[in-house]
């Protein structure tokens, strides 16, 4: 399962799809205390065997939930959706990601080998140490993510994403790991 939390993912064009519902709808139901499994299932789309929720279209919708509320929502998705693994891109929460990261058993941090990226990671690790979040720091696994090229024919992009280098990479990370979200 995949919940993509990214401001502008490009998936609409790459997948040639305009979704009627997305993560914004789920956030709305959650805030109205109307979240339940039927609503969740009405928002889930499938790409092969991967269940996913289309990302927010309007970035301001991220402000509707605190990071703690988003962590609670993700827990409900796992519990009520009967999922064992949840993959998140939490970049839009910035330093407010701690409530989300504290819930995770593993935090994969994509890194690059340039000085700017190395300094950003160093600052984040320093922040974790300064704020006493050593438990989160211990969960971080730095990874080098393969480039998604999309191939020559964009109509095959979904299959290439799942079964190409990126899909192989993610499957190898998750192989044998279940219940990656702490209870």
Feature names for model-found ranges:
Residues 24-27, 41-42, 71, 75, ...:
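Generic detector of well-ordered alpha-helical segments enriched in charged/polar residues
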Residues 10-25, 62-73, 110, 165-166:
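Charged, low-complexity, helix/coiled-coil-prone segments
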């Amino acid at each position: 399962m995949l919940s993509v939390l990214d401001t502008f993912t490009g998936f609409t064009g790459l997948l040639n799809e305009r979704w009627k519902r997305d993560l914004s709808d789920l956030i709305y139901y959650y805030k109205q205390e109307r979240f339940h499994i039927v609503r969740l299932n009405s928002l889930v789309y499938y790409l092969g065997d991967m269940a996913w929720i289309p990302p927010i279209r309007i970035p301001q919708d991220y402000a509707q939930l605190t990071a703690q509320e988003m962590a609670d929502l993700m827990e409900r998705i796992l519990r009520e959706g009967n999922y064992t693994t949840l993959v998140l891109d939490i970049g839009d929460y910035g330093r407010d990601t701690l409530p989300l990261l504290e819930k995770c058993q593993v935090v994969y941090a994509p890194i690059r080998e340039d000085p700017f990226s190395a300094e950003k990671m160093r600052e984040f690790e320093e922040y974790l140490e300064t704020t006493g979040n050593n438990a989160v720091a211990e969960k971080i696994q730095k990874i080098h993510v393969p480039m998604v090229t999309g191939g020559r024919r964009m109509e095959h992009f979904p299959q290439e994403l799942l079964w190409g280098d990126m899909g192989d990479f993610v499957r190898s990370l998750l192989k044998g790991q279940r219940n990656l979200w702490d209870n």
